[in-house]
């Protein structure tokens, strides 16, 4: 049974051993991630570490995450969150994670402190 939906920042915290990474590791074995957020993580690894996509895929596959495709339903759900999250500075990727969490009826797990101030009816756990 799945425990949460990971934001890119949460997975990047694990990869970089950043503050809060231990809280994320506790949830990794049952975590989901939206394909948008997986792409964000892959892009950061390519940019920061110069890894090839094959190397990134190999590295990320060790976490055995279940990837949720970002489909039309989630696209509209993420768009609907824009007016409610704009002032907090949330990105498209952030809204994709929140929309996925809402659709799966699971909490979102993030390292982004700005999410603490949100009142969206979506459970959010901040690891920092």
Regions found by a protein language model. Give the residues of each.
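Short active-site oxyanion
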Residues: 1-2, 28-31, 64-66, 103-107
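Short, well-structured N-terminal submotif of metal-dependent ribonuclease cores
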Residues: 1-33, 46-58
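Active-site-proximal, substrate-binding regions of enzyme catalytic domains
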Residues: 38-68
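Acidic, PIN/NYN-like endoribonuclease modules and their adjacent C-terminal/linker elements
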Residues: 98-128
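Histidine- and aromatic-rich ligand-binding microenvironments
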Residues: 6-7, 33-34, 90-92, 112, ...
């Amino acid at each position: 049974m799945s425990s949460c939906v990971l934001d890119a920042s949460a997975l990047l915290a694990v990869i970089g051993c950043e503050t809060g990474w231990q809280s994320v590791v506790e949830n990794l074995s049952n975590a989901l991630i939206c394909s948008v957020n997986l792409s964000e993580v892959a892009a950061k690894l390519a940019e920061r570490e110069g890894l090839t996509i094959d190397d990134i895929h190999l590295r990320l596959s060790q976490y055995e995450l279940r990837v949720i495709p970002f489909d039309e339903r989630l696209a509209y759900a993420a768009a609907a969150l824009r007016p409610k999250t704009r002032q907090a500075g949330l990105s498209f990727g952030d809204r994709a994670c929140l929309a996925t969490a809402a659709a799966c009826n699971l909490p979102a797990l993030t390292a982004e402190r700005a999410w603490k101030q949100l009142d969206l009816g979506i459970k959010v756990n901040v690891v920092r």
